[in-house]
């Protein structure tokens, strides 16, 4: 079983004349909740992601940090981020699982000029269709979290799929399945928000007064959320943006030029019809016949 076209609610690069796809049935939005306060940085989730998706990154060089690999890539869809910070005169080691946030309003999808290369399912998962990718990299620029990565081998972009192939058959993502401390949870978005509120309340009783849920409104909310000790300072967690938003360039492109492109297409099509009706399809043939007649007269 796999998702069908009827399960898709958005496609990249569809113009104003293309009707929006409709999900065949109501599907609850799903979400992955990552509780960074119980993560031990074991990287089991990284291994599970690599195994399930059959991706193998090259062995990098040790640069003096625990991060390995050092960054996301086309063959590393999730990495552990480690940050040493000082808060309230105490040294803290903050750990965050990094990867696609699956935004409700995805900047990558809006920026993509290749039709159908990026899609969003009714449950909120944002997926890349690599066979449609043209390798332009616009999705990378459009992502406020700097997640997608271009593979130089095939000139296509890749990212976490939230294990959509597992979710469709009722399984949880591979990283959730393998986490030994239960730091990663998966379910409906509402149930994950409820779980997060319970965890935040517990953290506040332990002295973390600024604990909270990271579910940024600037991108319409996300389908990967974090429970943070210091929710008032998300940038402490390896630069997690405080108020991520779709760039003004992407908004301008989709807000103004997209409808203008649709109008231009319609105008061109209408002009072609009027030309056909008013002038007719045989004008070129008539001119060619006249030219042949003139040449025949000259020969005589």
Swiss-Prot record:
[4Fe-4S] cluster 4 binds at residues 112, 133, 136, 139. Residues 280-300 are periplasmic. Binds 4 [4Fe-4S] clusters per subunit. [4Fe-4S] cluster 2 binds at residues 49, 160, 163, 175. Gene3D superfamilies: 3.30.70.20, Single helix bin. [4Fe-4S] cluster 1 binds at residues 39, 42, 45, 179. One of its GO terms (molecular function) is 4 iron, 4 sulfur cluster binding. The chain crosses the membrane at residues 261-279. It is found in: Cell membrane. It is a single-pass membrane protein. InterPro entries: 4Fe4S_Fe-S-bd (IPR017896), 4Fe4S_Fe_S_CS (IPR017900), FDH_Electron_Transfer_Unit (IPR051555), Formate_DH_bsu_Proteobacteria (IPR006470), Formate_DH_C_sf (IPR038384), Formate_DH_Fe-S_su (IPR014603), Formate_DH_TM (IPR015246). One of its GO terms (biological process) is formate oxidation. One of its GO terms (cellular component) is plasma membrane. Pfam families: Fer4_11, Form-deh_trans. [4Fe-4S] cluster 3 binds at residues 100, 103, 108, 143. Its cofactor is [4Fe-4S] cluster. Residues 1-260 are cytoplasmic. Keywords: 4Fe-4S, Cell membrane, Electron transport, Iron, Iron-sulfur, Membrane, Metal-binding, Repeat, Transmembrane, Transmembrane helix, Transport. Residues 30-60, 91-123, 124-153, 158-189 form the 4Fe-4S ferredoxin-type domain. Formate dehydrogenase is a membrane-bound complex, formed by subunits alpha, beta and gamma. Allows to use formate as major electron donor during aerobic respiration. The beta chain is an electron transfer unit containing 4 cysteine clusters involved in the formation of iron-sulfur centers. Electrons are transferred from the gamma chain to the molybdenum cofactor of the alpha subunit. This is Formate dehydrogenase-O iron-sulfur subunit. The gene is fdoH.
